[in-house]
């Protein structure tokens, strides 16, 4: 199965995920209601790290939880033992095999903290050391670059949020996500055309900046990673707020800026940034569900409309995945054979 096959499989993978691990989600919610936690700590690497960023925003905004990202090296390299007994500790890993992520969860379990694995392998070492397991049920992911395990990880986090604080309208929006993912896949022809125009000439599109904010900061990070690992593009991701604190000095006409700017709390700032980029003669690729915002870029990618902000990263990443794949092909590279990478990365 190719990378493109797995990108196209995401609506069906989402349907499977929405039906998976129902008992585990109920058990987690019961545990946290009977023994409330003060915070959440998430351990992850690579693409899963970007799912963790989504968890920071979603569980913070929707559930009122303080969410921090673990630094696995504190445990694995330095032998540290951060006090997390009053936290829910989550390990996110498609393979569940990275020793440093397993180590963080093991250390938390020794302190008596509730632990949760979000993984595509329910028999993995990560699952074995966790109190609860949400299986992604994405099916085998053969491509080196993670796609369907990323979107199903986001769905798993959204389902966790909903289990902790149920809401009928939110549940209905979540149930619609497979269909919205299918709608998002329909952007491929326009995305391919943009990728060919940007990256078709030898030596073109070897650098770019990717900017998102709020929930879409996770999308910016994941979009940039896909461009790096597949297309060998020096793609630098930023929060739009951080971008203005210095890195904006990097912008110049020959460095495209990819901006995720859908409707929502961060929209006004993204629109202001797009106006500033235009004044500086910088070409932008704008991904948005608002036509007026898309018109501010030289190129535009339509995101499905009507998706709640807290769920939108699940669909906004899909055209970004397609874009990275087509940029890779336009640069004469094979997206199914990324350089120096293997499917399972085990860091200590």
Please identify what each model-predicted range represents:
Residues 3, 50-55, 220-222, 226-229, ...:
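Conserved phosphate/anionic-ligand binding catalytic regions in large, soluble enzymes, centered on
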Residues 33-179, 183, 213, 256, ...:
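Glycine-rich phosphate-binding loops that contact phosphosugars or nucleotide phosphates
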């Amino acid at each position: 199965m190719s990378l493109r096959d797995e990108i196209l499989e995401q609506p069906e993978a989402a349907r499977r995920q929405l039906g998976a691990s129902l008992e585990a989600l109920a058990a987690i919610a019961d545990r946290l209601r009977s023994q409330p936690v003060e915070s959440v700590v998430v351990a992850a690497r690579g693409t899963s790290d970007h799912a963790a960023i989504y968890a920071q925003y979603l569980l913070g905004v929707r559930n009122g939880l303080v969410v921090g990202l673990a630094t696995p090296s504190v445990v694995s390299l330095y032998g540290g033992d951060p006090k997390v007994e009053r936290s829910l500790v989550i390990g996110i890993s498609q393979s569940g095999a990275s020793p440093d992520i397993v180590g963080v969860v093991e250390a938390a379990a020794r302190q008596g903290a509730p632990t949760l694995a979000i993984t595509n392998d329910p028999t993995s070492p990560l699952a074995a050391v966790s109190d609860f397991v949400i299986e992604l049920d994405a099916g085998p992911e053969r491509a080196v670059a993670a796609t369907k395990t990323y979107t199903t990880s986001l769905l798993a986090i959204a389902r966790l949020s909903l289990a902790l604080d149920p809401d009928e309208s939110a549940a209905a929006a979540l149930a619609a996500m497979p269909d919205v993912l299918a709608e998002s896949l329909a952007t491929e022809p326009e995305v391919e055309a943009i990728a060919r125009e940007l990256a078709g000439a030898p030596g073109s599109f070897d650098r770019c900046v990717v900017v998102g904010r709020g929930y879409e900061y996770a999308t910016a990070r994941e979009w940039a990673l896909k461009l790096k690992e597949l297309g060998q593009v020096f793609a630098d991701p930023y929060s739009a707020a951080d971008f203005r604190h210095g890195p904006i000095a990097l912008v110049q006409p020959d460095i495209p800026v990819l901006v995720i700017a859908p409707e929502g709390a961060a929209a006004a700032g993204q629109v202001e940034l797009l106006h500033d980029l235009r004044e500086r003669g910088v070409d932008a690729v704008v991904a948005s569900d608002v036509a007026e915002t898309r018109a501010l870029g030289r190129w535009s990618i339509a995101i499905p409309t009507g998706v709640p902000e807290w769920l939108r990263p699940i669909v906004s990443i899909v055209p970004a995945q397609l874009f990275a794949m087509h940029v890779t092909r336009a640069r004469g590279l094979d997206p199914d054979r990324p350089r120096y990478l293997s499917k399972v990365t085990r860091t200590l």
